[in-house]
């Protein structure tokens, strides 16, 4: 377990809280509010990302960093370099931010659309459920019984569509916290203990990467235990 897994769930929880307050503060969630949300998020993340991307390009080009300059292309500019397909050889660290950026894009769009039909409480629940279930289905559909650890890492652990559920668990936690605050307050201690036990068990269970457990179930259990 590394800090990225914690970051995904925590990010979903914090951003989920912001979005919940946003959709409950008005009877009509307008498209201008979508752009306002994106503008705030992108002003916080994109300038630094592009600066580091540029620095990486020159470091690799002039062989200060030992990576492959031929792996660089426009997809790094729009965060599609690891959307469906694995990437490696250039700017390895960018995988997690790409997942985060797509979460910023997709979640508010779901909320905007579902609010046309459902009340805020049900809208947010459905959105969180979609974010949790779709990546699991995708991972199951793409199960590979001949994969090694390297390809498990780049093809499952570090692609956007495989990992959005980690943030989805954070969204679900923010929904429970917002609408069922008393339940949360009464049960946080036993939940923390049980979650910690589950996490310790999951991360210490040595299972080969070519199994359904490692490719499909593992990520869900880790995120659920953090939630």
Task: Show where each model-derived region lies.
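Juxtamembrane transmembrane-helix termini
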Residues: 6-43, 48-64, 107-116, 171-178
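Small-polar-interrupted transmembrane alpha-helices in polytopic inner-membrane proteins
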Residues: 10-11, 52, 121-141, 192-203
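Membrane-interface helix-loop-helix regions
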Residues: 31-41, 46-99, 131-158, 225
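Alpha-helical transmembrane segments of multi-pass integral membrane proteins
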Residues: 58, 167, 171-172, 189-227
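Membrane-interfacial loop-to-transmembrane-helix junctions in polytopic alpha-helical membrane proteins
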Residues: 67, 84-88, 120, 150-160, ...
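Short, amphipathic, aromatic/basic-enriched membrane-interface segments that mark the entry/exit
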Residues: 93-98, 184-190
